[in-house]
Curated annotation (Swiss-Prot):
CC annotations in GO: cytosol
Protein name, per record: Uncharacterized protein YccJ
Name of a matching Pfam family: YccJ
InterPro entries assigned: YccJ
Length: 75
């Protein structure tokens, strides 16, 4: 079983490859139960639950989900 540090590193790499904010990637993996196939599906389809969790992790006003910029005020 991977350590929390290993999971965080993997999520960070995953986020970087997809031009996605780390907060969004972390929230995707939490919702997916750290199942990479499920995480990929969520990333492709989008999720309001993920956005709520991601903005709860930061005080930033905007985050990136691939090519899209998500504004806090729209969540």
């Amino acid at each position: 079983m991977p350590t929390q540090e290993a999971k965080a590193h993997h999520v960070g790499e995953w986020a970087s490859l997809r031009n996605t904010s780390p907060e969004i990637a972390e929230a995707i993996f939490e919702v997916a139960g750290y199942d990479e196939k499920m995480a990929e599906k969520i990333w492709e389809e989008g999720s309001d639950e993920v956005l709520v969790k991601a903005f709860a992790k930061t005080d930033k006003d905007s985050l990136f989900w691939g090519e899209q910029t998500i504004e806090r005020k729209n969540v």
